Amino acid sequence: MQVKITDLTDQLIASYASVGGINHLDGTNLPCKNGIVGITNDLLQLLFPGFFDNKITHSSEIKMETALLMDSVAGRLEDEISKSISYNPPNETSENNTRGEAKELTLQFLSQLPALREILTTDVDAAFDGDPAAKSKEEIIVSYPFIEAISVQRMAHVLYKFEIALL
């Protein structure tokens, strides 16, 4: 007996109803995991310019490149925060209020990036001071995985303080 794709599709669709584990289909979607990963990668680039991408930026272009990346992150982060706000019960606000709140929270979060950089600098310094094998602070940023992990945790903590769930 040959199984057809339509039969397999029907079985998979049936599992959506019985098992769950799917995003909201008939309402506001939850934040997108892949979208959040992309935003996080770009935030790491903003926190550590030149360390999290292959692009070589000249010092004369850093302001423009940073502004472009910041604008891109802001738009995408606002979308994901809006989804998070819509998910948080009880939520009886209109779509316009949700978007406005998301925009404000996005700007508040992004305003914390300079302070996050200062804190992360102390993390890099501590790793460098505590590891006699480390040759430079740049080596710490490039090759020590905890820097990325602590950066993500510190960003998540800021989101938590702003009561932004699911990001």
Regions found by a protein language model. Give the residues of each.
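Terminal amphipathic alpha-helical/low-complexity segments used for targeting or macromolecular assembly
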Residues: 1-166
